[in-house]
Amino acid sequence: KLAGGNILAVNEFVESAIDTYKSNYPNTPILPNDIKELTGHDLLKAAEIQQGELDILDGSPPCSAFSIAGKREKGWDKTKKYSDDKQVDNIEDLFFEFIRVAKDVQAKVIIGENVAGITMGTAREYFNRIVNGFGDIGYEAVGKVLNAADYGTPQARQRCFFVAIRNDVMDDVGINFMNMDSIIYPEP
């Protein structure tokens, strides 16, 4: 909103988060589905746009599976408490559900965010699978750990950002894999 964008639709299934969205964005459609049950076509319909029209699809799947403060791989392949009223199976796989939805939406740009721990140790395999997953659906993607304080926020918080650009858009604007990282992630 501060950058001048419009939020066309939201997917959230935790009641307290839905209530917050409704308070902050009363005119934005909210799809209260588990992302495993959501399709990109559901999202497009709620946003009242066609496949390929969306400029930016933004998603931040839960990060507890990759947080260095959590159980990490000891908690993988298990059902976890996600909120006071929700449990989720294999929370570490939700980024791939986001990619599945993104395949149907075909936004020009996709942004995903998670904890820096997704780049460390055995979680690095997930990082690589996410980058490759975007490639499998027609995007060139890069992921990088950034410190929020370097970009003007009042907190020193390390987060991993994935940016994926649809291949035809990259061609149209003259971005290629060799210069993509420096264009997307300029030095602060």
Locations of the language-model features?
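Class I S-adenosyl-L-methionine
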Residues: 41-54, 64-188
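Residue-level recognition of the N-termini of beta-strands and the immediately preceding loop/turn
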Residues: 8, 54-56
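Compositionally biased, intrinsically disordered/low-complexity regions enriched for serine, proline
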Residues: 23, 58-59, 183-185
